Amino acid sequence: MGDLSLQRAAGALGAWVSGVGLADVAESDRVYARVRQALVENEVLFFRDQDVAPQVFAAFAQCFGEVLDHPAYATTEQSDAVQILESTPENPSKIELWHSDMTFMAEPPNFTLLQGKIIPAVGGDTLWASATAAYASLSPGL
């Protein structure tokens, strides 16, 4: 485990994380605290090259609180805390349009985690938007 390093990904939100992995966060309270603070400040964090088992991904997720399941998705065989979002001709995506994760719940989660396992060379983009920045940019009259 190295030192946590952040590189801004865009103006409104997001940062690339290097120097620590998902397993490091799950194993170290100090690393978790730094990553959580970075997440709060940047709203989206990107960890590159994290080909971890579902159990490790679940342990990482559980650091941030209770893991909620989405009723539309199956879980992995290795962990009930990790679900599979698939988009193939046989199983097209259920979330092709803009959405905000789990906002149908009375108390939606604070964070959402996504790990890309099989990603197409073209297309398949996932985009993020900052509701914080959008709200802050509203005119005072609104």
Name these PLM-found stretches.
Residues M1-L142:
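Non-heme Fe(II) oxygenase catalytic core, chiefly the N-lobe of the double-stranded beta-helix
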